């Protein structure tokens, strides 16, 4: 979709509280909407109160990180390790055990319920 292209390929950001995946609470896996690379397990998802799907840990080797200095801020951008699609940002204000908050754009992901 145009919204997926904007986020995944142009590093856009969806408006908070607009993704159905923010309210997804079933067991399953969140994958890249661009290539279906498995990114996050639902067991690491938590409600961060930000309006974006948030996780405290990605699956092994699923994502990469780069420095993002856009908009006068220095942040760590998160991208799909397979296709390079922009997913969101990671912050150090998350819960235990990692203390990290992977703040993801829901439009950049798909969800597959556990069978």
Regions found by a protein language model. Give the residues of each.
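A short Gly-Trp-Pro
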Residues: 2-115
């Amino acid at each position: 979709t145009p919204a997926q292209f904007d986020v995944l390929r142009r590093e856009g950001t969806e408006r908070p509280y607009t993704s159905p995946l923010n309210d997804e609470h079933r067991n399953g896996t969140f994958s890249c909407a661009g290539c279906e690379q498995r990114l996050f397990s639902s067991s690491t998802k938590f409600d961060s109160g930000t309006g974006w799907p948030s996780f405290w840990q990605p699956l092994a080797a699923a994502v990469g990180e780069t420095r993002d200095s856009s908009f006068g801020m220095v942040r760590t951008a998160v991208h799909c390790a397979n296709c390079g699609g922009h997913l969101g940002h990671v912050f150090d204000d998350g819960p235990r055990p990692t203390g990290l908050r992977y703040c993801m754009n829901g439009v950049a992901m798909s969800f597959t319920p556990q069978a």
